[in-house]
Each structure stands twice: as C-alpha cells, then as structure tokens.
Amino acid sequence: MSARLGRAASLWLLLAAVAVAFADSSIVVLALPDLLRAYGSSIGGVSWVVTAYNLVLALASLALVWLARRLDERRSVRIGLALFLTASLACGLAWNLVSLVAFRSVQGLGGALLLVGSLPLVRRLATSPKRGVTLWIAAGVVGTAVGPAAGGLLTELLSWRAVFFAQAPLAAAALVVALRAHRGERPAPSERPSPGASSARCLSANIALALASAALVGVLFLAVVLLVNIWRFSPLTAAGIVSAIPLTTFLVQPLAVRVQSRSTAAAGVFALAAGLAGMAFLPARSILWVLASLALAGIGLGIVVPTLSHIALSGGGAGTAPGAWNVAARHLGLVAGLLIVTPLLTSGLSQQGERAKLQATSAILDAPLPVKTKLELAFSLAPVLARPASKGLPNFSDEIAQRHIGKATGLGEKLDSIVQAAFTRGFRRSYLATGLLGLLALVPFAFALPAGSRRSRRRALAAPALALLAAASLLSAETARGAFSYGSKPRLYAPCAARKPFPGHGADAASQRLALETLDQVACHYDKSREQLVVALAAKGADSKALRSLLEFGTVNWSALSKWLSKL
C-alpha cells in the first residue's frame, strides 16, 4: 500500500514539474510591464525573456530527437530538473536584462531535458502506458493554459521575481523523486514505433500542433498585452480574466481524450479561430466580450492540443523521441507565432497611434475650454501620446484632473475612450493572423486523423456545426454592437476645408471662433488640418506660446512662427 502511494506521489510530482515547464512558455507575460520598469528596456528587449525560453527549449528538443536512442530518460530528467531548478533561482536573482535572458535560456535547456525524458517515466509510473500518455498531455495543456494567470497572480501579490522563485520548491521535490527512480524495463514490442502510415500520421499531427500553438500566441500573449498595456488593468485583474482559458480547457479536455476524430478536432480548431476572431472585433472596452472570446478559444485549446498530441505520441513508440518531437512542435509553433505577430502588432499600434493623436487633438481643440488652456493641453499631451503603446497608455482622466480642467466637459474620459479604442483596433491584424494560423492546422490533421465510416461522419458533423454556430453568434453579436466602427479611422477635416464654427454666444465663443479660424488659416497654408498642424509643431519641439499669441489676436505673425513652421 505504501509503495503504491509512493508511486502515485512520485507520478503527480513529476506531472506537476511537467506542467510548470510547459507553463514557463507564457508565465512571465503578465510580468513584462514590471520588467520594463525595472530594467528601462524596450518591449523588444523584454520580449526576449519569453522568446529565449521557448526558442532554446524547441531547438534543444529537436537535438534530443537525434539522441533519442542513446538518451537515458532518468538521466535526462535529473539533469533537466537540476538545470531548471538552478536557472529558476538565478532568474529570480537576475541583476539586469541580459542576465535574465541568459538564465531563461538555461531554464529552456533544462525544460527540454525534463519534458523529453519525463514521458517514458510517466508511462511507467502510471497504471498503464496509455494512461501515462494521457496524463502527460493533460499536464502540458493545463500548464500552458494556466501560465499567464499564475504569473499575473504572483506578480501582483509579490513581484516578478516570485514567478521564478515559486518554481524552485516544486522542481527540487521532483528532482528527489527522479533521483530515486529505478530503471524500467524495455518497452514491449507492441509499444515500439510502427513504420509507414503511423509515422506519416505522427508527422501530420505534429505539424498541425505547431500551427495550433502558433495560434495560441493570440490568447496567451496578445490578450495579456491588450488588458495590461492598453486597457490598464492590473496584473491581478488580467490574471482573473485570462483564467477563462484554463477553466474552459478543463471542462472540455476529458471529451477530447475520449473522442478523437476529425470532426471533434475540426470543432476545436473552429472554436480556437472563432475566439481569436472575437478578440479581433471587440466592440468596446468590455470584460464580458473578452471573457466570451477567451472562453471559446479555451474550448478550442482543450480539444485540439490533447487530440493531436495523442496521435503524435501514440504512434511513435515508448522512447523519448515522440516526446521530443511533440515538445519541439509546440514550442517552435509558439516562437513562429511570436515572430509573425510581433511586426504586425508593432505596425498596427504605430498606425493607430498616429490616428489617436489626431483624434485626441481634435477633441481637445473642440472642447469648451479657454484657448490658452486647450493649446497648452494639446502641446503637453502630444509627447505622452507619442510614447510607445508597449509602455502602457496614460490615464488622461487623471492627467486632466491634476490640472483642474475639463472636469465638467468629461474631456479626460473622452480622451481615454478615443485612445483605447484606437489602440485596441491596432491588435486586429495580429489576432486575424493567429486565427488564420489556427485554421491552417485543418490541412495536416486531415491526414493525421481517421475519417471513420460514412454514418459516423454524418453523425460527427454536429461538433463542428456547433462550433461554427457559436462563432457566428459571437461575431454577429459583436457586429451588432459596433465592432467595425470601434476604433475606426477618425473622420477629420481635409486641409482648407470649411469647418463648423465653434458653437455658443458671447465674447468667449467669439474669441474661440476667431482663434480656430486663424489656426485653420495657418494650417491651410501648409496643406494641413488644424489637428495635423498642432501635432506636427509639438513633434518638432515647439511650445504653445507663439501659436497662442497668434490665435488670441487673430492675426498671423509669420515671422514669429517661422522658427517652427519652416520645419514642417
């Protein structure tokens, strides 16, 4: 009895270590804003904390494929856990970004040795080899899904260093188990890999798994960046929101294990792609829309990854090679997804940032504030708007409240709404790209999964039909709530076009009209709108004084402005 309990404890400790190694692919995402502040780096530099781990883990797993026949799984797990434990502690003590990236690379190497060697051990410790494969896959899916939420919770409650320190005790306990493990028997002939169709199915399943993993970048990384950097949620709140992914994954994963068919896997792909499309067409800054989209993506994750992993591992024998291929496929997919999405996101945010500056400047110039106040505000906020979105959007409500202006007009809330809507739309192409990567997984897994009988195929069409219905319902609801207009290109007046006069009566309204008409006259001379002129002057380092004096008197003093206007 005690031996059986010890065996079970060893199994669950090893599975927990496997889950942590998979979770590390995304566990630091919610800590990236803290790392940006701690090290004063760019988002490109800090992103290597994520990329280094996944890249080294994927490449090391590929190398271990060719060493599979010579690799002793017990030694692989022991060395892997020792490296993972040491690197986790070192990451928590990192003194700069370079050292953190270096230690994350070592952690990735340890993770590769652990994951590749753990599969044969789990097969032997479980009640049956088949159950061992199921548990190993489940640990990987759970770890991948829980990673962002767990990292966000630790970052908010303690610090980003706690994300790494928390992994050390578990790795140490698993290392003790691995050191006590005995050499198992050689696999029976029935467990050894079979050539031909089985190999082709394994290859197809791993290719499909890589594409699905690339799509997961949308829910594991993009969603977190949107919630923290653009919508300004705390890491703890963001962790609660993204927990919709593991919750729905847990619910559907048992179904995926029991029913492995093309139709079920297709339903998972459609659900994953639909969740990403839902994130691409968010109609408002609303947690409910994000939860609905992430829940749908979580359902897809819980179906696709276990189904494809079972096929990839079941036909490859009992050694370390099947696990190596599986781990490599998943993490190469993540790295490829990051490489594809990063330039799309950078471009989208840059483009929307320019639009947001013009639209916010227009709102400031049209606000019922004194000319002096609105110009000072427009020029002072221009550098803030020019700051990269990766460093987080400013809180305009607080900025304006500190200046004791615009409270009655709701200008701060209006600026927040304008800028957040614009930058949210900047994620659209990235989400659509990840959704397309997910749909491409349909091609290879058509060869990986059995088609079944004609009767079973007709009956099985219900699963993908249900997924498509859920996708259509979500996208239709978002469209009805204005998804296509949310954050769209602002309708600004063309240079020299006639504009509506400033509303109101009395001396103040007359002064406003005169000032804005003069501003339009100057802007027209340079073939710009008034918003483009103010943004351009602020970008050149001008202040509002010269422009304010010109507007207050209603005459164009070209010589006073020549210093700045000549640069336009």
Predicted features and spans:
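12-transmembrane solute porter fold
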Residues: 6-32, 40-65, 69-77, 81-87, ...
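C-terminal region of N-terminal signal peptides and the immediate post-cleavage residues
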Residues: 156-157, 282-283, 343-356, 450-452, ...
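Juxtamembrane non-transmembrane segments of integral membrane proteins
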Residues: 269-271, 349-382, 522-525
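Helix-loop-helix hairpins in multi-pass membrane proteins, especially solute transporters
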Residues: 54-187
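Phenylalanine-glycine-rich, low-complexity intrinsically disordered regions
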Residues: 183-195, 228
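Surface-exposed, interaction-prone regions with an acidic/low-complexity signature
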Residues: 2-14, 27, 37, 62-76, ...
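Transmembrane-helix exit segments and adjacent C-terminal regions of multi-pass membrane proteins
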Residues: 2-10, 214, 372-468
